[in-house]
């Protein structure tokens, strides 16, 4: 099966979709790699995540997709009072347990509750005068706001969940792309998942051994 992805110019208009970190492994190990794009640019195509030495063909199409559709239901803040309360309690725990201090790090996923957590935590950081050492993406406009308001010097990004994340990746030197090799690879010497102080992610199922299902709903 070919591995298909757009080129690194996906950070530039007209078609924006952001980072390709999770497609990087596919491009390196697939038998055949096809890059699909509607935005051919002169060499070199910067920034590049998928390098040309892994690519067999580049296919130009009229339109890859609709950038405004990047934002889906899972990348919008929850309106559920129960989930907002969960998010607030999580942020208060991080603060009251002493985890929220200068130089701490956190990851907030794209789920509605995790996004709300980031907003509550941001308010508490401002109130306490605390800045993070780094923040782990997937990036959203809420993490971008923290970067641009000086609450963190760096976003280490693995996915781009909205157009503000794409813009920030293009414009902010402190917004850096990453791949699963450096993020979550248990055998990687530079694996920074274990460096995170706080991780707030959504899951449809969690068992008593803390194994989490984030792929399918409970009905399969």
Identify the residue ranges that each predicted region occupies.
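Glycine-rich beta-strand-to-loop/alpha-helix junction loops that act as flexible
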Residues: 108-117, 137
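Conserved phosphate- and dinucleotide-binding cores of soluble alpha/beta proteins
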Residues: 1-105, 116-125, 129-133, 142-220
């Amino acid at each position: 099966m070919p591995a298909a992805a757009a080129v690194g110019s996906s950070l530039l208009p007209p078609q924006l979709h952001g980072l390709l970190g999770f497609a990087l492994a596919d491009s390196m190990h697939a038998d055949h790699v096809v890059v699909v794009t509607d935005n051919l640019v002169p060499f070199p195509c910067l920034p590049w995540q998928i390098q040309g030495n892994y690519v067999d063909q580049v296919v130009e199409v009229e339109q890859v997709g609709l950038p405004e559709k990047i934002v889906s239901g899972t990348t919008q803040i929850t309106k559920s009072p129960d989930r907002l309360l969960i998010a607030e309690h999580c942020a208060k725990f991080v603060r009251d347990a002493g985890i929220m201090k200068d130089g701490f790090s956190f990851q907030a996923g794209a789920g509605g509750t995790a996004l709300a957590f980031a907003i509550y935590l941001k308010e508490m950081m401002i109130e306490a005068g605390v800045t993070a050492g780094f923040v782990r993406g997937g990036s959203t406009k809420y993490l971008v706001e923290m970067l641009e308001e000086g609450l963190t010097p760096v976003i280490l990004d693995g996915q781009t969940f909205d157009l503000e994340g794409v813009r920030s990746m293009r414009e902010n030197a402190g917004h850096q792309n990453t791949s699963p090799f450096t993020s979550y690879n248990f055998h990687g010497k530079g694996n920074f998942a274990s460096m995170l102080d706080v991780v707030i992610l959504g899951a449809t199922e969690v068992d008593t051994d803390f194994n989490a299902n984030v792929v399918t709903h409970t009905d399969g």
